Amino acid sequence: PTRGGKSYVNFPAINALESLGNRWQKMSRDGIHDRMKMWGLNTLAAWSSTEIRQDKKTPYTLLASIWWLTGKKTPSPFRDDYVEDLCKALENSAWAKNDPYCLGIFIGNEFEWPDHFSQLVFELPDGDTTKKWVLRQIRQKYASLDQLNAAWDASFSNWDQILQHGDTTHRASAAKDIDPLYFEFAQEFFRKSKQAIEQSLPGTLFLGCRCHRGPSVLGRAAV
């Protein structure tokens, strides 16, 4: 077989074929289901094959994700095409619609949510949709750039300068206005993700996201 454009030898499959015959795939999957029951395991792992999940013998969960434009393991829910792209990714799981063995679906894998939202915002490239959204919120709070300069003890000459990538001069002051926006950012991710699920797999339970780490604001935003 091939994977990623490269050929490889599947020695476990060769051994199973020799010992079990042409029906080795079905017999191997049956053995996995039986062993899981004997060992007290009640749910298939995230990367289990589609075939073993479609056997309808052991409950499983789904996982869907899209490439985040930032290149970071954090979502970009303010992208205009976020829901559309996620719906396309969910098409791969259309076979599980209304399957009673499907416990639900996770959106995203091993997200690394920073402790502070400002930390993420300043690391994003200039022009990123999340950064643009943050800038809009800040401009709603301050009627003029002079007011912001006074609050941040800064001397910006235009609004585009205040969140520039790599500028660390006023981050401590900026964090007081940016960090409270974390809740709305996370809430938008959960809201739009659920929207995509309801469009593509209506009735499927949204299990949230799989996280490497994350602050408590995620739990509040997910409710």
Outline where the language-model segments fall.
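Active-site-proximal beta-strand/loop segments in catalytic clefts of secreted hydrolases
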Residues: 47-49, 63-67, 107-110, 209-211
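Polysaccharide-binding and catalytic clefts of secreted carbohydrate-active enzymes
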Residues: 1, 10-18, 99-222
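Active-site-adjacent substrate/metal-binding segments within catalytic domains
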Residues: 1-55, 64, 69-101, 171-172, ...
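Proline-centered loop/turn at the N-terminus of a beta-strand
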Residues: 57-59, 204-205
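Short loop/helix-cap segments at secondary-structure boundaries that form the rim of catalytic
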Residues: 50-58, 219-223
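Short secondary-structure boundary/capping segments
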Residues: 58-62, 120-123
